[in-house]
């Protein structure tokens, strides 16, 4: 009987070890957080982004363009999760599932003109209020021309 209990406990331990870790966004501290790419202070939290690395560290960004530059340089392999602020709600949303809108006239901290929203409906509402733009998905951002847009 003890042998079977040990086997069951061992199996439970193995299964618990296989559970996927969950990652949560951390609070941005404007006084101390700086963008990993451009070293600017995170003054405009409504446009901030962050990557939770699998090792527990966080990389912070002041604009989606800087976050994407980091991913391009480092790949996605060590990313546990990535978050960007929803431009309409000022809430954290998943970078990989967000809907993006580009308009060269949208103001963003690094002048990339790309904002993130949680749905196509929210993106359309944003464009109605702020001016027409180009709808983009995460995969589109990977090929986007990220220079500072004028």
Task: Cite the ranges covered by each PLM segment.
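Mature extracytoplasmic domains of secretory-pathway proteins
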Residues: 59-94, 99-100
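Short aromatic-glycine-(Arg/Gly/Cys) micro-motifs in beta-strand/loop hairpins
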Residues: 44-55, 93-109
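C-terminal motif of bacterial Sec signal peptides marking the signal peptidase cleavage site
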Residues: 14-17
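Bacterial signal peptide processing site
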Residues: 19-21
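Positively charged n-region of N-terminal signal peptides that target proteins for export
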Residues: 1-4
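Short, flexible, mixed-charge glycine/proline-rich loop motifs
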Residues: 24-31
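C-terminal partner/receptor-binding element of secreted or periplasmic proteins
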Residues: 118-150
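Post-signal-peptide N-terminal segment of Sec-exported extracytoplasmic proteins
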Residues: 31-76
